[in-house]
């Protein structure tokens, strides 16, 4: 869990920037987007197969 403690003379803007930086470093948004909707096992397999195809296509270029 990400948490930001406001300093004595710290503004809200700088604390918000720190919070956003911590959230992006923790990788919360991609995880949140991934779990937004339930993904059936078939959808998982399709997604992984598509990712594997993309990866193979990229590797074959070089």
From Swiss-Prot:
Stored InterPro entries: Ribosomal_bS21, Ribosomal_bS21_sf
Biased composition annotated in UniProt, kind: Basic residues: 44-62
Keyword terms of this UniProt record: Ribonucleoprotein, Ribosomal protein
Gene Ontology biological process: translation
Keyword Cell inner membrane: no
Similarity remark: Belongs to the bacterial ribosomal protein bS21 family.
Name of the featured protein: Small ribosomal subunit protein bS21
Annotated organism of origin: Trichodesmium erythraeum (strain IMS101)
Upper taxonomic lineage: Bacteria, Bacillati, Cyanobacteriota, Cyanophyceae, Oscillatoriophycideae
């Amino acid at each position: 869990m990400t948490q930001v403690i406001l300093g004595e003379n710290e503004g809200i803007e700088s604390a918000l920037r720190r919070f956003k930086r911590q959230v992006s470093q923790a990788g919360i948004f991609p995880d949140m987007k991934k779990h937004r909707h339930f993904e059936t096992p078939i959808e998982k397999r399709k997604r992984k197969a598509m990712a594997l195809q993309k990866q193979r296509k990229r590797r074959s270029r070089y």
